A protein has these predicted regions:
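Cytosolic regulatory regions built on CNB/CRP/Popeye-like sensor folds
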Residues: 1-165
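N-terminal Rossmann-like dinucleotide/flavin-binding domain of flavoprotein oxidoreductases
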Residues: 155-192, 205, 211-212, 269-329, ...
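Glycine-rich dinucleotide-binding loop and its adjacent helix/turn
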Residues: 212-232, 341-395, 491-495, 501-502
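N-terminal Rossmann-like FAD-binding beta1-loop-alpha1 element of flavoenzymes
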Residues: 231-258, 385-393
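Glycine-rich FAD pyrophosphate-binding loop
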Residues: 251-270, 398-409
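A Rossmann-like FAD-binding core segment of flavoenzymes
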Residues: 290-332, 337, 393-494, 536-540
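A conserved FAD-binding loop/helix module that cradles the flavin
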Residues: 386-388, 503, 509-541
Length: 541
């Protein structure tokens, strides 16, 4: 990314007089006068509007759950407050107070802010770029958002850190073994070691060893699900296919909700770099691509509920209903199944015991830091495996790649060539994982691979093993309503609409659909194509 100082004009732009007058038409209320030092919006305030300053100043600060604050900037006339959370009415990560002489400002609640961005393409581009860059700055600088207190690199810390990072939320890890504010808080709160990690939400609330769902609830990022509200489209899955549906459907005026049990991006979101996606000649990370699509969906008014697990689809009578965890319900006139696939796990004893303790199914910057300078192994021969190899190899001493057959049968040529040029990558063909061993702390210590040709076993000492061996369809929750093939993928196209399943009004796109091309671009294409078929359905109902 460019030097932060060079992006300041884009991060904190000043609207012209003409742009301010145009923006007035979209304000959610009359201009308001704030006294010197008065709170304009507070850290953690949900639904806080963005404010367009007409005169005076607003001093913006960041803070965390330990009540540590630091200045970010001072907005003047023609500038506006807020960051990405203001698009969806989520709790503010930053706070603002009127300057020494007070200020006058116009409010734009989430709906009116989105209306302004859509109503004026010029102003919308300025605002969207600024909101995204401000979030990036908050993540890069730290000192804002959620604090995780525990042992860095532990399975529990990694899981929460992955959720926050892939959700684009700033976070900081404090080592409980080092005396400081984190350890002091643990001792003060009487938190035992088996209750770690301790999580401090931006508002100061403490969570002991929370799940990602509990953390999301504390952060206020899960919208309220109204069982009586009828959406035009409910999308299950926030990967490339699901987010594409959300963007196109919402931009065409349909009411849309997207639900995902984990985080945005799906399996593609874990890709370190996608180099063959149209329009990105230098490549783009899966997380960056998902983040852009996520913000684009918010811009057009789509509701996104993450992490919310959909447990079953009810399709026997009345509107289609998604039954979620804790019996929460979402009703819609159409349902798009974009739930993708689940990571496939090899049949190896005790595998689950090492997940998060040395065994991983994705490769992000977090994993790269953990295995820096070490010998690691990776199993898999598809494009996702290739992208992970190219990303991880510069960080590690040696990367052993284990595949069952020649890479030319399963991987794109550009990745094969890139891997061949990496001096620290060893390719082991025809060897399969057969056993795992742990150390006294329960972390991975070694892996044994068996050669298929003669059964010879070889043991490798290693603390990090990455598994990229494909995926199985994530469609079990919908099988009571839709037909699947023998492998569990959802069948579509029996009627006049190619992406509609055996149940009218229920569509399947992306990796979960039988016969689909397992590529990000193909998933995005299906996400766009399904919207026209939904329009056709709704026009007949």
């Amino acid at each position: 990314m460019s030097d932060p100082d060079t992006r300041a004009p884009q991060m904190f732009p000043v609207l012209s007089h003409a742009q301010i007058e145009l923006a007035r038409r979209f304000a959610s209320g009359p201009e308001h006068r704030f006294a010197p030092g008065e709170t304009v919006y507070a850290i953690g305030e949900r639904g806080a509007p963005a404010w367009l300053i007409l005169d005076g100043e607003i001093k913006v600060t960041r803070g965390d759950g330990l009540d540590r604050t630091a200045p970010i900037t001072v907005h003047g006339a023609g500038q506006f407050t807020g960051e990405v959370n203001q698009l969806a009415g989520r709790p503010s990560i930053a706070g603002g107070h009127a300057g020494d002489l007070g200020c006058t400002a116009l409010p734009f609640d989430p709906a009116h802010l989105r209306a302004l961005m859509i109503g004026s393409a010029e102003i919308g581009e300025i605002i969207m770029r600024a909101l995204i860059l401000r979030r990036v700055r908050l993540i890069e600088q730290g000192g804002a958002g959620t604090i995780l207190i525990g042992i860095p690199g532990s399975a529990e810390i990694i899981a929460l850190q992955e959720f926050l990072t892939r959700s684009g939320l700033p976070n900081l890890v404090l080592d409980v073994r080092v005396y400081g504010e984190g350890r002091a808080l643990v001792e003060q709160a009487g938190v035992s070691s088996d209750e770690l990690p301790l999580v401090v939400c931006p508002g100061g609330a403490l969570l002991r060893r929370p799940t990602s769902v509990e953390l999301a609830a504390c952060l206020g990022i899960i919208p309220d699900l109204d069982p009586d509200h009828l959406y035009d489209v409910a999308v299950v899955g926030a990967g490339p296919a699901g987010l594409a549906t959300a963007v196109y459907a919402a931009s065409e005026g349909l009411s849309v909700i997207v639900l995902d049990a984990r985080t945005m991006g799906g399996q593609a979101g874990a890709s370190a770099r996608i180099e063959n996606y149209l329009g990105f000649p230098t490549g783009i990370s899966g997380q960056a691509l998902a983040g852009r699509a996520f913000n684009q969906a918010l811009k057009f008014g789509a509701e996104i509920a993450i992490p919310v697990a959909v447990e079953r689809l009810v399709c026997d009578a009345g509107p289609l209903t998604l039954v979620c965890a804790e019996e929460r319900r979402v009703s819609a006139r159409s349902v798009v199944i974009a739930s993708g696939a689940q990571y496939r796990r090899p049949d190896v004893p005790n595998l689950a015991a090492f997940e998060g303790k040395g065994v991983a199914y994705w490769a992000s910057a977090i994993e790269a830091r953990l295995c820096a300078g070490e010998d690691i192994a990776l199993v898999g021969g598809g494009n996702s495996a290739g992208q992970a190899i190219v990303f991880l190899a510069p960080f590690v001493r040696t990367l052993r790649l284990f595949v069952r057959r020649d890479l030319s049968e399963t991987m794109s040529r550009y990745l094969i060539d890139r891997i061949a040029a990496l001096p620290n990558v060893e390719i082991h063909s025809g060897e399969e994982l057969s056993a795992l061993e742990g150390d006294e702390a329960g972390n991975l210590a070694a892996a044994t691979f068996r050669r298929a040709a003669d059964g010879e076993a070889r043991r490798y000492a290693l603390r990090h093993l990455f598994l990229f061996i494909g995926a199985d369809p994530n469609a079990g929750w919908a099988r009571d309503c839709v037909a699947t093939d023998e492998d569990g993928f959802i069948v579509s196209g029996a009627g006049s609409r190619s992406l509609e399943t055996s149940r009218a009004g229920v569509f399947a796109i992306g990796d979960v659909r039988a016969g689909s091309t397992k590529r990000v671009a193909a998933a995005v294409g299906e996400g766009a194509a399904v919207v026209s078929q939904i329009h056709s359905l709704l026009a007949q109902s």
